[in-house]
Swiss-Prot record:
One term of GO molecular function: nucleic acid binding
Keywords for this protein: Nucleus, Ribosome biogenesis, rRNA processing
Positions of disulphide bridges: none
Membrane-spanning intervals of the chain: none
Segments of skewed composition (Polar residues): 15-25, 256-266
Biased composition (Basic residues): 1-11
Species: Aspergillus fumigatus (strain ATCC MYA-4609 / CBS 101355 / FGSC A1100 / Af293)
Protein's recorded name: Protein pxr1
GO CC annotation terms, alphabetical: nucleolus
Compartment(s) of residence: Nucleus, Nucleolus
Gene Ontology BP terms: rRNA processing
Length: 304
């Protein structure tokens, strides 16, 4: 009921079962029923009816009103504790069994059955629809056989970083053969993609493939597109690395004469990448100028 609903206050009367009306003999209902041949304690309806066999003593009793204070549906029984039974009933049954001449083994077997039934009822109330099933043991699976060749082709081996001695000498080692083979694979993938596009543009091609074949073909196309995208990304990364390596080599060649006087550096500095290399080059030149006595004298205009 919302806030805009009509507010109705209901009160439970002092006679909710309406026994005062049923007991009174002065009312119109009691008088008309007596006029029709009804007497107190009899059933309502014809005595020779087809459902007369279903009448019980409850049919002659009063209709009782039950207050519904829950959200259960009509006819639903409220949840009650199955273990909430009469206490001491098991011991009383055992006593009756001894009086009937049963042995102790029979009594123990019956008691065990009752205990098992009690545990089963408790489990049914505690875990209603849960069934514990053994799932076995976990076994490690071998992924080497299931690895697809497409995932193996996409493996990229980046070239290792050059050491400080190689930077000083201005020598750079070539990339390993894995990257070269990967570039060849990228080129072949591009050629295959170009051939497929040419075949697709041809007229008169029949498109009567089954849904499964078309699905497999779409998956192959997606894998090849991913492979070509990885190849393009690898090419751009290698081009950026080569450009930065050339700039580092030029900067190192300019400062080899100054570094030779101070001796070889023991600590390895991190080489900047990208647009920061130009700023780092100017910072290195300023550091070298401050380390050199002659350049300091020129800065402070001191004549020697």
């Amino acid at each position: 009921m919302g806030l805009a609903a009509p507010r109705k206050k209901t009160k439970i009367s002092h006679d909710p079962n309406n026994t005062s009306w049923s007991r009174s003999t002065d009312g119109f209902g009691h008088r008309i029923l007596k006029a029709q041949g009804w007497t107190p304690g009899d059933f309502l309806g014809a005595r020779n009816a087809t459902h007369s066999d279903l009448f019980t003593t409850a049919s002659a009793s009063h209709i009782r009103v039950v207050l519904k204070d829950d959200t259960l549906g009509l006819g639903a029984r409220p949840k009650r504790d199955l273990l909430d039974g009469p206490t001491g009933l098991d011991a009383f049954k055992g006593l009756l069994g001894r009086l009937n001449g049963k042995s102790d083994t029979q009594l123990e077997a019956e008691q065990q059955k009752r205990d098992d039934a009690k545990l089963a009822r408790y489990a049914a109330t505690k875990w209603q629809t849960v069934r514990f099933i053994s799932g076995g043991l976990l076994v490690q699976e071998k992924d080497n056989a299931t690895a697809s060749p497409a995932s193996q082709d996409l493996r990229v081996d980046f070239p290792r970083e050059t050491s400080s001695n190689e930077h000083e000498n201005g020598m750079f080692k070539t990339e390993p053969m894995d990257s070269y083979s990967h570039q060849e694979g990228c080129a072949t993938a591009r050629e295959e993609e170009g051939k497929k596009k040419k075949k697709k543009n041809k007229k008169g091609k029949e498109m009567d493939m089954s849904p499964r074949k078309s699905r497999e073909k779409k998956q192959e196309k997606i894998q090849k597109k991913r492979k070509i995208g990885d190849c393009d990304r690898l090419d751009t990364e290698t081009a950026d690395r080569t450009s930065t390596k050339v700039l580092v080599a030029v900067a190192n060649d300019k400062g080899t004469s100054l570094l030779a006087s101070n001796g070889p550096s023991t600590s390895r500095e991190r080489q900047p990448m990208g647009r920061r290399i130009f700023r780092s080059r100017h910072i290195e030149q300023k550091k070298r100028a401050l380390m050199d006595d002659k350049s300091l004298n020129e800065i402070f205009m001191i004549k020697t």
